[in-house]
């Protein structure tokens, strides 16, 4: 059975692409009565506030018709930003050589938090280099991952 995020991705991908953007990812954060649906869009030339407004209008109209979320929620449409979330193995592959932070669902070697250079992506396995040592992490065990901006 598909997760809510997967169903929303299937629903929203084509309309976002039709607007000329990439659907970077979706996060649904449950928080009491008012949850938040975050829709990240991207474009090679960056994303403006007007781009977010255009996509938000389209997404909101589509969600009103399809009604895939039965509870109350806030809709946020934004760029993934410089510290963008890495939500798919393809995101890690796009940023090989860059530094990322990773938080695991279940500890590996008594450790849940990692910060290292993305070295390799092999299917569902992500390799980070941390202090000269490679750590291989299963994508399915990643709770959260973000790119660390490089200002050099």
Curated annotation (Swiss-Prot):
Coiled coil: none annotated. Belongs to the RimP family. It is found in: Cytoplasm. Its main location: cytoplasm. GO terms for biological process: ribosomal small subunit assembly; translation. GO terms for cellular component: cytosol. This is Ribosome maturation factor RimP. It comes from the Bacteria. Gene3D superfamilies: Ribosome maturation factor RimP, C-terminal domain, RimP-like superfamily, N-terminal. Keywords: Cytoplasm, Ribosome biogenesis. It comes from Tolumonas auensis (strain DSM 9187 / NBRC 110442 / TA 4). It holds the Pfam family RimP_N. InterPro entries: Ribosome_maturation_RimP, RimP_C, RimP_C_sf, RimP_N, RimP_N_sf.
